[in-house]
Amino acid sequence: MLRQIKVAVLFVLVAFSLMMEGTPDANADSKLPDPIKAGVAEKLFRLDCGRSLANDESVWTPGENAGRSIEFSSTCWLIKHGSEWLLWDAGVPEAALNDPRGWSTLPKLIVYHLDKTLTDQLAEIGLKPRDIARVAISHTHGDHIGNVGLFPNSTILMQQAEYSWIHSLNGPNDDVNQLMALARKLLGTPKNLQLIDGDTDVFGDGSVTLISTPGHTPGHQSLLVHLKNSGFIILSGDVVHSEENFEKNIVPSLNTNKTESIASMEKIRQLIAIYKATLFINHDKKQTDKLKLLPAFYD
């Protein structure tokens, strides 16, 4: 039995080493956690941060489903680590709650609606926006940073590549230019902005790790969370929009780089294999509807 355990541990370590060599960002200074020694976060809450209806699914599945409508979920996640709280993504702006027309990043394509504000959901577990120490954003599309302004004193974590991109002159087309302009408006000039480069261990113990997954946008990132009972969970951001897209390597037409998008999906597959992780896909409504919702949590 002892020999079997040693062999199993050796297999994990070898596989981890191979993954580190093969991932897009792999280098000697990688911040990916040791799958055996990683610390744990205490709780992971899902918040409902909006829902949307798009009028042409083929934007997300090029060559298929032209003219077919599709509904997406938008999810924020709240992580308790010791006495500190970290929010992952900030969702659709709270102002959308009282607008029957909804809110949009690209009005000709998609409309978002909100059923409950982020502030009200935090209040359900006794928190206020000022209690959130850090806000990490997957990328700067408006449905992910719509409420960053609620957290003026929080540290905002984002990739340097993402920040530089939205402040560059032009994107590849008018739709992307519109998304970039909205991002600059919603993000503003955070008082406490922490720009990072590549994979980053947020708390220094391997419990919460920002994973560089460019392609959807130049500085897109995902999040790897380690919990005591639930194990490793990957929060996708928009590295993938549905299980089908993930299985087939389908790259949405609004992504800024197809090659990077496919490489990032492969990186996520490698992480799933090494950490035996569960992938929560932000916009996949079928999956999201089955997940626990605050005040319930994963631990």
What are these regions (language model features)?
Residues 9-19:
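Bacterial N-terminal signal peptides
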Residues 1-9:
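Bacterial N-terminal signal peptides that target proteins for export
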Residues 109-120, 222-224, 229-299:
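Cap/insert and terminal regions of metallo-dependent hydrolase folds
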Residues 49-50, 90-92, 140, 161, ...:
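Active-site metal-binding loops of divalent metal-dependent hydrolases
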Residues 7, 20-131, 160-212, 260-276, ...:
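Metallo-beta-lactamase
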Residues 46, 69, 76-80, 86, ...:
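Core dinuclear metal-dependent hydrolase active-site scaffold
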